[in-house]
């Protein structure tokens, strides 16, 4: 990336930091993780959870959701102003699962948001610790990315369901800040912009008046975020054109869809962070580990080491396969929903299979599901190797396209080819004369046509033994070049419905 110098590292985004050196970053990320851990321990005490119940991922999700809801200023204000039946705007809660007489029971808990905010601040030295909240949002987003396919959302905005590899972070809330923007895929940003433009087309006042100015600022900011993800001059120039449009309409929507398609080959840079559930950080803090003193990174060996030594449990429905449930959560923890399955399998040390072949539903349990038949099992979240997370998108050469399979956005910096079905992708570009024909379009198509599926990305980069903390001896895996591995291919995953 040419503009690397002006960019803050994720860890800086994660902690709202000014420029910091590596140790300061590790310390501030560690501080954030420690705060989440302390909060989780306190909540387990409040809820009188046993050690086993505290390590249950479903309980972790409920507790995380409670604190996110307690700090959701906008929604809280909205709930105050639009009281709805049966919803107390001042309270938050959810299902907590406990083991009673050899059976799992569901208990609905309700807490004052004020009380939850107090516990959170207390665990974070009196601060609001927004970075920690964002971290939990990204963990939820990564879990959603792994669990659901966004076909319906893609089709609604006029995009192709095969573009699902561009949809990282599509369920992140708007308030997830710079760290959230960094992990959003090209398709996610395009979808947000298209929704905005459509509102403008349907509502005459959307861009007008005092509010319209704010809307316009948000539009241009989102355009700049998306522009920053593209790595070729032509794609960036097209984004300038979309941003500067006086009155965004269908031409801009067409341009954005064109750009999203182009990102299947000319991949954008999208950050990947290993965000783990709070029930992993809690026990680590409880055992006396000092994250701030030791330092922590979301993109190095630390999350792998932490998962290596963690016990996490999950509720299992009668006909679910515990190994498949483990894979789902492993992928979410490593932010690997859109990674090539060949690479994930190598790192994990067990075969990672496509979503459609998994016998498991999501991690969350609906309130109407029968608890009598519910079992639980240990999630296997360990890995054979570790690898550095990337945000380059794996293009082989900065200004040139590299082969991008129709469904991969690399997570790990590991050498591989990125096979893709070029005829399928290129077919999407023929005869689409809507929008504008321009030199930029021609240039983008030319670069895509030049891409070769057999080119190698991340040349010389490999995985590391877990004992190799300083990443000194890369092990470069060799993959079957013809056999691409995309997770959502030929798939029947559930849809994500808010």
From Swiss-Prot:
GO terms for cellular component: helical viral capsid; host cell; host cell nucleus; ribonucleoprotein complex; viral nucleocapsid. The keyword Ribonucleoprotein applies. Transmembrane segments: none annotated. GO terms for biological process: symbiont entry into host cell; viral penetration into host nucleus. Residues 1-22 are annotated as: Disordered. Pfam families: Flu_NP. One of its GO terms (molecular function) is structural molecule activity. InterPro entries: Flu_NP. A motif (Unconventional nuclear localization signal) lies at residues 1-18. Keywords: Capsid protein, Helical capsid protein, Host nucleus, Host-virus interaction, Ribonucleoprotein, RNA-binding, Viral nucleoprotein, Viral penetration into host nucleus, Virion, Virus entry into host cell. Late in virus-infected cells, may be cleaved from a 56-kDa protein to a 53-kDa protein by a cellular caspase. This cleavage might be a marker for the onset of apoptosis in infected cells or have a specific function in virus host interaction. It is found in: Virion; Host nucleus. Residues 8-21 have a biased composition (Basic and acidic residues). Belongs to the influenza viruses nucleoprotein family. Homomultimerizes to form the nucleocapsid. May bind host exportin-1/XPO1. Binds to viral genomic RNA. Protein-RNA contacts are mediated by a combination of electrostatic interactions between positively charged residues and the phosphate backbone and planar interactions between aromatic side chains and bases. This is Nucleoprotein.
């Amino acid at each position: 990336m040419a503009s690397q110098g002006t960019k803050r590292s994720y860890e800086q985004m994660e902690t709202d930091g000014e420029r910091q050196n590596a140790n300061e970053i590790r310390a501030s990320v560690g501080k954030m993780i420690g705060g989440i851990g302390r909060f989780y321990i306190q909540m387990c005490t409040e809820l009188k959870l046993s050690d086993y119940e505290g390590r249950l991922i479903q309980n972790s999700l409920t507790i995380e959701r409670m604190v996110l809801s307690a700090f959701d200023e906008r929604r809280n204000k909205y709930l105050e102003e639009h009281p709805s039946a049966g919803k107390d705007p001042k309270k938050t809660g959810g299902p907590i699962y406990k083991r009673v007489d050899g059976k799992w029971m569901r208990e609905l808990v309700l807490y004052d948001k004020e009380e939850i905010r107090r516990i959170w601040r207390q665990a974070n030295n009196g601060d609001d610790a927004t970075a920690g909240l964002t971290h939990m949002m990204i963990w939820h987003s990564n879990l959603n990315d792994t669990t659901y396919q966004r076909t319906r959302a893609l089709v609604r905005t006029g995009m192709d369901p095969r573009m699902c590899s561009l949809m990282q972070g599509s369920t992140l809330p708007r308030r997830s800040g710079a760290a959230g923007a960094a992990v959003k895929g090209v398709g996610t940003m395009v979808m947000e912009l298209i929704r905005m433009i459509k509102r403008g087309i349907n509502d005459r006042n959307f861009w007008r008046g005092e509010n319209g100015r704010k809307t316009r600022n948000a539009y241009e900011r989102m355009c700049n975020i998306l522009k920053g993800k593209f790595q070729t001059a032509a794609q960036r120039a097209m984004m300038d054109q979309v941003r500067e449009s006086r009155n965004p309409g269908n031409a801009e929507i067409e341009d954005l869809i064109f750009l999203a398609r182009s990102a299947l080959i000319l991949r954008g840079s999208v950050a990947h962070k290993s965000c783990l559930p709070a029930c992993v950080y809690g026990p680590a803090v409880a055992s006396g580990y000092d994250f701030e003193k030791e330092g922590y990174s979301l993109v190095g060996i630390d999350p792998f080491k932490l998962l290596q030594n963690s016990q996490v449990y999950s509720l299992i429905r009668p006909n679910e396969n515990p190994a498949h449930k483990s894979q789902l959560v492993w992928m979410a923890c490593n932010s690997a929903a859109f990674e090539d399955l060949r690479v994930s399998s190598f790192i994990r040390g067990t075969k990672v299979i496509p979503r459609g072949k998994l016998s498991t539903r999501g991690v969350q349990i609906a309130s109407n599901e029968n608890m009598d038949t519910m079992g639980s099992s240990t999630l296997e979240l360990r890995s054979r190797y570790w690898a550095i997370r990337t945000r380059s998108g794996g293009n082989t050469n900065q200004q040139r396209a590299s082969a991008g399979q129709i469904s991969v956005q690399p997570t790990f910096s590991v050498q591989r080819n990125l096979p893709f079905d070029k005829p399928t992708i290129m077919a999407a570009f023929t005869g689409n004369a809507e929008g504008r024909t321009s030199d930029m379009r021609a240039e983008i198509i030319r670069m895509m046509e030049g891409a070769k599926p057999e080119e190698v990305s991340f040349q010389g980069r490999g995985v590391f033994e877990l004992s190799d903390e300083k990443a000194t001896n890369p092990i470069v895996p060799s993959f079957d070049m013809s056999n691409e591995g995309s997770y959502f291919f030929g798939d029947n995953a559930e849809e994500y419905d808010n």
